[in-house]
């Protein structure tokens, strides 16, 4: 066979696109339809083949694409049960999918609207009263100190009531005489003595605070210390919270002002205990800024994260500070490994107890920024939640009837504490 004959044969085997549309495609459609109907309804197709009214040409093929479409219409009329079930199931499945999709989207939109309305864009609540400490089951002899902070008194417990707690009448009278003698020799009458300004005390406190600020900011010591502390506490954080990092820290540049100091008997103590009432006022800008991320751990850990930046500032603090002295006779050490010397020092030491009145005033300035691209700024609800938690932490530790105490160092002169001034270089 020559090359010209091969080329003519290949040319005859090719088909134009118009011929495929008018001849080959209808035949393919016919075969597909017939195979589908034969597989589903064999008996009906046998009866249909005898009574068929299709207009088929002598060579068994449809005349064009119009004949194929006409055949589909006729088949749907003659056999509605075979095609109707398929159409009904498709319609039902399509409607079920659309219905579920619509309900799912609607629920997400409603949940998002509820979150925005009641959590993010809700109005900031009016200034409510300060949180109150929870009731405690341990009450002391004096009603002004019925609570003891467990976090600061972990190494101390009350002694046995029968052996050490109750003072006999002779010891009580001796204590009353000591208080009266102190007031007499210091020319102080708790009933008529005017309040003092404490200007000299403010100067001393200001020097101490200034020294603390200088040491804190030397080579960013306080910033590194806080970040290290938070890093050690990271395993205790909840799973939905990422590592917390301090981004801003300001220790302020002002000093607290103490004033209106007066000495009085502790309420409900039967004139057996003295305490000092001091008004304190701080108008400064103490700031702490942190950043973290809220993690979404479903369906797999860390699938999404929401950046959060918070800056909390205390701009005003006013309160009445109560200060009193007490010895260690009401407490006993629970440390088993302490030496006898330490035990003697614990029993003979004195403690400075302090607390704040419930009528304190603490004002905050809270800034928040949530999101990475589309950011929500200064959400009132977040500010109110943070403010409430800070006040709650403060009330549960330092607000009456709870108190804190600091052990006073021994005032007895010791050689290891002796110092002398360095000679001035000329």
From Swiss-Prot:
One Pfam family linked to the record: MMM1
Gene Ontology MF term list: lipid binding
Post-translational modification: Glycosylated.
Residues that carry a glycan: 6, 50, 55, 59
Residue ranges of every copy of the SMP-LTD domain listed in the record: 194-409
Topological domain ranges for the Lumenal compartment: 1-100
InterPro entries assigned to the protein according to its UniProt record, in alphabetical order: Mmm1 (IPR027537), MMM1_dom (IPR019411), SMP_LBD (IPR031468)
Lipid bilayer topology: Single-pass type I membrane protein
Deletion consequences: Loss of mitochondrial integrity. Abolishes growth on non-fermentable carbon source (glycerol with ethanol). Slow growth on fermentable carbon source (glucose). Synthetic lethal with VPS13.
Transmembrane segments: 101-121
Subcellular location: Endoplasmic reticulum membrane
Membrane topology, Cytoplasmic segments: 122-426
Main location: endoplasmic reticulum
Keywords of this entry: Endoplasmic reticulum, Glycoprotein, Lipid transport, Lipid-binding, Membrane, Transmembrane, Transmembrane helix, Transport
Record GO biological process: aminophospholipid transport; intermembrane lipid transfer; mitochondrial genome maintenance; mitochondrial outer membrane translocase complex assembly; mitochondrion organization; mitochondrion-endoplasmic reticulum membrane tethering; phospholipid homeostasis; phospholipid transport
One Gene Ontology cellular component annotation held by this UniProt entry: mitochondrial outer membrane
Entry's family note: Belongs to the MMM1 family.
Domain remarks in the Swiss-Prot or TrEMBL record: The SMP-LTD domain is a barrel-like domain that can bind various types of glycerophospholipids in its interior and mediate their transfer between two adjacent bilayers.
Additional free-text comment from the UniProt record: Normal levels of MMM1 require MDM34.
Quaternary structure note: Homodimer. Component of the ER-mitochondria encounter structure (ERMES) or MDM complex, composed of MMM1, MDM10, MDM12 and MDM34. A MMM1 homodimer associates with one molecule of MDM12 on each side in a pairwise head-to-tail manner, and the SMP-LTD domains of MMM1 and MDM12 generate a continuous hydrophobic tunnel for phospholipid trafficking.
Function, as annotated: Component of the ERMES/MDM complex, which serves as a molecular tether to connect the endoplasmic reticulum and mitochondria. Components of this complex are involved in the control of mitochondrial shape and protein biogenesis, and function in nonvesicular lipid trafficking between the ER and mitochondria. The MDM12-MMM1 subcomplex functions in the major beta-barrel assembly pathway that is responsible for biogenesis of all outer membrane beta-barrel proteins, and acts in a late step after the SAM complex.
Record protein name field: Maintenance of mitochondrial morphology protein 1
Source species of the chain: Saccharomyces cerevisiae (strain ATCC 204508 / S288c)
């Amino acid at each position: 066979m020559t090359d010209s004959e091969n080329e003519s044969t290949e040319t005859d085997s090719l088909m134009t696109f118009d011929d495929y549309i008018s001849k080959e495609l209808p035949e393919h459609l016919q075969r597909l339809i017939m195979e589908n109907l034969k597989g589903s309804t064999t008996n009906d197709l046998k009866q249909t083949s005898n009574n068929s009214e299709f207009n088929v040409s002598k060579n068994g093929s449809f005349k064009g694409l119009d004949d194929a479409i006409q055949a589909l219409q006729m088949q749907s009329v003659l056999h509605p049960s075979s095609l109707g079930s398929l159409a009904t199931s498709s319609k039902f499945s399509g409607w079920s999918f659309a219905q579920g999709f619509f309900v799912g989207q609607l629920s997400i939109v409603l949940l998002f609207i509820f979150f925005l309305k009641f959590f993010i864009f809700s109005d900031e609540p009016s200034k409510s009263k300060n949180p109150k400490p929870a009731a405690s089951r341990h009450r002391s002899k004096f009603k002004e100190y019925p609570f003891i902070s467990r976090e600061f008194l972990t190494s101390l417990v009350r002694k046995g009531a029968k052996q050490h707690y109750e003072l006999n009448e002779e010891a009580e009278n001796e204590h009353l005489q000591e208080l009266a003698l102190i007031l007499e020799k210091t020319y102080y009458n708790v009933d008529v003595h005017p309040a003092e300004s404490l200007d000299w005390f403010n100067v001393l406190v200001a020097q101490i605070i200034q020294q603390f600020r200088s040491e804190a900011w030397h080579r960013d010591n306080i910033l590194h210390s806080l970040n290290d502390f938070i890093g050690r506490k990271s395993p205790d954080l909840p799973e939905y919270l990422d590592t917390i990092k301090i981004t801003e820290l300001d220790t302020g540049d002002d000093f607290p002002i103490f004033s209106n100091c007066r000495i009085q008997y502790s309420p409900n103590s039967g004139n057996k205990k003295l305490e000092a009432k001091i008004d304190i006022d701080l108008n400064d800008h103490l700031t702490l800024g942190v950043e973290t991320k809220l993690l979404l751990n479903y369906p797999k850990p860390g699938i999404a994260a929401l950046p959060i930046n918070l800056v909390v500032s205390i701009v005003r603090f006013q309160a009445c500070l109560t200060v009193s002295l007490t010895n260690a006779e009401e407490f006993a050490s629970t440390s088993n490994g302490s030496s006898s010397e330490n035990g003697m020092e614990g029993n003979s030491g004195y403690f400075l107890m302090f607390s704040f009145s419930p009528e304190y005033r603490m004002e905050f300035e809270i800034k928040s920024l949530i999101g990475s691209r589309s950011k929500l700024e200064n959400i009132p609800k977040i500010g109110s939640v943070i403010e409430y938690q800070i006040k709650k932490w403060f009330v549960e530790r330092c607000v009456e009837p709870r108190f804190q105490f600091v052990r006073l160092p021994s005032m007895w002169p010791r050689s290891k504490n002796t110092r002398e001034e360095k000679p001035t270089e000329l």
